[in-house]
Amino acid sequence: MTSVVVVGTQWGDEGKGKITDFLSADAEVIARYQGGDNAGHTIVIDGKKFKLHLIPSGIFFPEKISVIGNGVVVNPKSLVKELAYLHEEGITTDNLRISDRAHVILPYHIKLDQLQEDAKGDNKIGTTIKGIGPAYMDKAARVGIRIADLLDKEIFAERLRINLAEKNRLFEKMYDSEALDFDSIFEEYYAYGQEIKKYVTDTSVILNDALDAGKRVLFEGAQGVMLDIDQGTYPFVTSSNPVAGGVTIGSGVGPSKINKVVGVCKAYTSRVGDGPFPTELFDEVGDRIREVGHEYGTTTGRPRRVGWFDSVVMRHSRRVSGITNLSLNSIDVLSGLDTVKICVAYDLDGERIDYYPASLEQLKRCKPIYEELPGWSEDITGVRSLDDLPENARNYVRRVSELVGVRISTFSVGPGREQTNILESVWANI
């Protein structure tokens, strides 16, 4: 029994897709356990970029099984489009498996997402308008439509009719918006269901059988710990649990079968959407990091907010997700800066604190306390070992590890697979 979970430790966009793709080389099964097509990940193979939103990164290994678990909310339209994109690029998807228990995102979820966000005005959350939140709402309210329902023509029609009638009353009466048409949704989405039918199965059985057989299973999280609905900057969060504990619920695998948790982070911090961000930069340094790091959302295309590395956030993520290993990405983006900073604690009303407050009002008053380190000017994109890094960059990496309290297993100096450097194998000693 060998399993590793990959989680984002910040607000998403840490490079999880790249690290998952890298670790997938030694895995036999790769599974997603939460989120939907609101999460974007970019994988670079032989210099070519592939952007995925729903399908696991392991799809690029045809001999390995890629799983979309029951905790994922699936937009069939997006899934079919993504499958077509991969097929056009010559990538086989015969190794994909989709949970029959996963819930389905339908057009009324997306419409409701937009209407709710618009109604919030200045208090908007910054949702990607992908229908993720409303789909999880239906799931919790026990009125959601699952993949198993989508494949059954009569059941899908019955449940869609009931749900759409309720949603249309909401659109017309509360939001003064037009109703959606049952026939067009039913025909379009039932057809999508038939297209993906061959991939659908009980993925919990596949995952548990693989683990019981001693195979290596890699679980891929979406978003990041600070977007977790319980442990993140609520309400500026996603509607699921990206923390490692979400694996057990979203994949149907018990907690006793999880061995290691790899926390992925960047050498700085970024965030898309609204919400607290104590180390955010508004100066030319922030602009430089954004441009050099190409900090624009994979899903939204929106410029990401950027800031210095925040060890308070990282220690929070380590604690609530049980992180055992750290993967530090994008060190190269900081090259050329005379000074680099790390937030070591916060000043809250004159008091030094080293924890991340739950209160948004307190977070607004938190001022980062920085430790300054000398920067480096060298181009490090070709570095292939820790010893090859300039001394100042090497000291920065070590200081990050010390402050977070987790050993670094890999570090990256660029987007390519070959730019990921291994300090220790996360698959070893399991």
UniProtKB/Swiss-Prot annotation:
EC identifiers of the protein: 6.3.4.4
GO molecular function terms noted in the UniProt entry: adenylosuccinate synthase activity; GTP binding; magnesium ion binding
One Pfam family per UniProt: Adenylsucc_synt
Cofactor-binding details, from the entry: Binds 1 Mg(2+) ion per subunit.
UniProt keywords, alphabetically: Cytoplasm, GTP-binding, Ligase, Magnesium, Metal-binding, Nucleotide-binding, Purine biosynthesis
Binding, substrate: T298, T299, T300, G301, R302, P303, R304
Cellular location(s): Cytoplasm
Pathway: Purine metabolism; AMP biosynthesis via de novo pathway; AMP from IMP: step 1/2
Active site, renumbered: D13, H41
Gene3D superfamilies hit by this protein: Adenylosuccinate Synthetase, subunit A, domain 1, Adenylosuccinate Synthetase, subunit A, domain 2, Adenylosuccinate Synthetase, subunit A, domain 3
Binding site for IMP: D13, E14, G15, K16, N38, A39, G40, H41, T128, R142, Q223, T238, R302
Positions with a binding annotation for Mg(2+): D13, G40
Single Gene Ontology BP annotation: 'de novo' AMP biosynthetic process
Reactions the enzyme catalyzes: IMP + L-aspartate + GTP = N(6)-(1,2-dicarboxyethyl)-AMP + GDP + phosphate + 2 H(+)
Residues engaged in binding GTP: 12-18, 40-42, 304, 330-332, 412-414
Cofactor: Mg(2+)
Gene Ontology CC terms, in alphabetical order: cytoplasm
Keyword Metal-binding recorded: yes
First-tier enzyme category under EC: ligase
InterPro entries the UniProt entry points to: Adenylosuccin_syn_GTP-bd, Adenylosuccin_syn_Lys_AS, Adenylosuccinate_synth_dom1, Adenylosuccinate_synth_dom2, Adenylosuccinate_synth_dom3, Adenylosuccinate_synthetase, P-loop_NTPase
Complex formation: Homodimer.
Role according to the record: Plays an important role in the de novo pathway of purine nucleotide biosynthesis. Catalyzes the first committed step in the biosynthesis of AMP from IMP.
Family that this chain belongs to: Belongs to the adenylosuccinate synthetase family.
PANTHER family: ADENYLOSUCCINATE SYNTHETASE (PTHR11846:SF0)
Protein name: Adenylosuccinate synthetase
